[in-house]
From Swiss-Prot:
Active site, renumbered: 122, 257, 288
One GO biological process term: fatty acid biosynthetic process
Keyword Transport found: no
Domain comment in the entry: The last Arg residue of the ACP-binding site is essential for the weak association between ACP/AcpP and FabH.
Enzyme Commission code: 2.3.1.180, 2.3.1.300
NCBIfam families reported in the protein's UniProt record: fabH, PRK09352.1
Keyword Transferase: yes
Domain of life of the source: Bacteria
Region (ACP-binding): 258-262
Role according to the record: Catalyzes the condensation reaction of fatty acid synthesis by the addition to an acyl acceptor of two carbons from malonyl-ACP. Catalyzes the first condensation reaction which initiates fatty acid synthesis and may therefore play a role in governing the total rate of fatty acid production. Possesses both acetoacetyl-ACP synthase and acetyl transacylase activities. Exhibits relatively broad substrate specificity regarding the chain lengths of acyl-CoA, and can use branched-short chain CoAs. Can use butyryl-, isobutyryl-, and hexanoyl-CoA as preferred substrates over acetyl-CoA.
Record's protein name: Beta-ketoacyl-[acyl-carrier-protein] synthase III
Catalytic reactions of this protein: butanoyl-CoA + malonyl-[ACP] + H(+) = 3-oxohexanoyl-[ACP] + CO2 + CoA; 2-methylpropanoyl-CoA + malonyl-[ACP] + H(+) = 4-methyl-3-oxopentanoyl-[ACP] + CO2 + CoA; hexanoyl-CoA + malonyl-[ACP] + H(+) = 3-oxooctanoyl-[ACP] + CO2 + CoA; octanoyl-CoA + malonyl-[ACP] + H(+) = 3-oxodecanoyl-[ACP] + CO2 + CoA
Taxonomic source organism: Cutibacterium acnes (Propionibacterium acnes)
Length: 332
């Protein structure tokens, strides 16, 4: 029998650089309350959000993703031609084909790099990180560009006062490459498909049947999500730490999906994180950007000096599906 030839494998992978872009319009809680029946104080108390970013009409998922990716590429010192693959995590690309990754690859001049989108909802970036890690370690790629990007303001239901204030627009990107030492820990991922209706986006036929709708809208059962996050997500975060062979005290930074500050606090307490661990609260002036929240938070924490190159960080995303994915990484 003729054997199948395989490519040389790499030992490990790591994050090389990051970049981010945010919607240019700042929407404060006060302004939000002119659109919905609520108060700025109630929104902040329930979520930790004081303002969020909405993109303008000219700011698209393609343009924001390209901006974040270009920054990451410049910081990496690599040439565009060296990128072997681009993975874009998003639920906001309204054209099923071609992929958003293909559009961004064209803008960046990535040539014949493999390009595809991934729908992992709010866990999309962590899913994509796991794929990039596997691609590199199996020899399928040397450098992978991973992007999380969303324009959720288009899909926000302003008639739903329980969710309208949550969502935001932006993009985060990272370049992942081969490494001689472990830079990305084993992923802990999975789903609870019996909870499909807990968070969902309307299908296009339903949305298009309503003359008042331009895009499908988000529907979420907030209490059910909170209950799930308190139990299952907290458990999976602990598993990701254990899979990396470390303890909570070894962490420098905890960067969960920026869904709600109360969820972040509950998971942090469950993990028994010591005071030495910096916990990300990027949601305060960013809002919830689904697949973009983790990479945006990583980049902003690095740029603001809240985290540093070489730090050990636990990242975890969770959202519609219900899906989750998390791993320990070393920051670039």
């Amino acid at each position: 029998m003729t054997a199948i030839k395989t490519r040389p494998v790499h030992g490990y992978s790591k994050f090389l650089s990051t970049g981010s872009a945010r919607g240019s319009r700042v929407v404060t809680n006060k302004e939000m309350c002119t659109l919905i029946d609520s108060t700025p104080e109630w929104i902040e108390q329930r979520t930790g959000i004081t303002e969020r970013r909405w993109a303008t009409n000219s700011e698209t998922v393609a343009s924001m993703g390209t901006t974040a990716a270009r920054t990451a590429l410049e910081r990496s010192g690599l040439e565009a031609s060296q990128i072997d693959a681009i993975i874009v995590a998003t639920v906001s690309h309204h054209r099923p084909s071609p992929s958003l990754a293909a559009y961004i690859a064209r803008e960046l001049g990535l040539g014949d790099a493999a390009a595809f989108d991934l729908n992992g909802a709010c866990a999309g970036f962590c899913y994509s990180t796991a794929l990039a890690d596997s691609m590199i370690r199996t020899g399928s790629a040397n450098y992978v560009l991973v992007i999380g990007v969303e324009k959720l303001s288009e899909m926000t239901n302003l008639d739903d006062r329980s969710t309208a204030f949550l969502f935001s627009d932006g993009a985060g990107a990272a370049i992942i490459g081969a490494s001689d030492e472990p830079g990305i820990g084993p992923v802990v991922w999975g789903s609870r498909s019996d909870q499909l209706k807990t968070i969902e986006l309307e299908d296009w036929p339903t949305a298009s049947a309503d003359p008042n709708k331009i895009h499908p809208l988000i529907r979420m059962e907030g209490r059910a999500v909170f209950k799930w996050a308190m139990t299952d997500v907290a458990k999976r975060a602990a598993e990701a730490i254990a899979e990396a062979g470390i303890t909570p005290a070894d962490l420098d930074v905890f960067i969960p999906h920026q869904a709600n500050d109360r969820i972040t606090d509950v998971v942090s307490r469950h993990l028994k994180l010591p005071e030495s661990v910096t916990v990300c609260h990027d949601i305060a002036d960013m809002g919830n950007t689904s697949a973009a929240s983790v990479p945006i938070a990583i980049d902003r924490m690095l740029q603001r000096g809240q985290a540093h190159s070489g730090d050990l960080a636990l990242i975890i995303g969770f959202g519609a599906g219900l899906v989750y994915a998390g791993q320990v990484i070393r920051l670039p």
